[in-house]
Regions:
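Bulky hydrophobic segments
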Residues: 1-140, 144
Length: 144
């Protein structure tokens, strides 16, 4: 039996593959490109982690795939950004939380087992700064 996160990850990939095929049959070029790009993006974190030697939990991979599905597939292909005024806010909130957690883990891994221990406020500040920086870069990408 597969864990729920593995099922979610496979379901998202299957949905994107089917949608890309349907868009190809209908001749909707932009939808084909976006769904195939989203499908490729769901595989990149695991590929990157294996090359670097990290082990990412299935739940983390499923969360990334869910975010890619929400931003690219639902947001762009199904125009959720235009249909729901709060869609962009919800995705920015989710990405800020995710990048904050990622920043915390990166800083925690840097200082773990080292003789230089970072105080908790410094770890929190660096995590916050990473989340804000990535959010600012995302806004630049979004409006460019």
């Amino acid at each position: 039996m597969f864990p729920a996160s593995a099922i979610v990850l496979r379901a998202i990939r299957l949905l994107l593959a089917i949608e890309a095929g349907v868009a190809m049959i209908r001749g909707v070029g932009p939808a084909v490109f976006v769904t195939l790009a989203a499908l490729v993006l769901t595989f990149l974190p695991a590929l990157f982690a294996s090359r670097v030697g990290l082990r990412l939990p299935q739940s983390f991979l499923a969360a990334i795939a869910l975010f890619v599905l929400a931003t690219l597939y639902l947001g762009e292909v199904h125009a959720f950004y235009d249909r729901f005024w709060w869609w962009d806010l919800a995705l920015h909130f989710g990405s800020a939380m995710g990048f904050g957690i990622l920043g915390f883990l990166l800083v925690f891994m840097l200082f773990q087992g080292d003789r230089y221990a970072a105080p908790p406020w410094a770890v929190g500040a660096l995590s916050f700064c990473l989340a804000v920086t990535v959010g600012a870069l995302w806004e630049i990408f979004e409006y460019a």
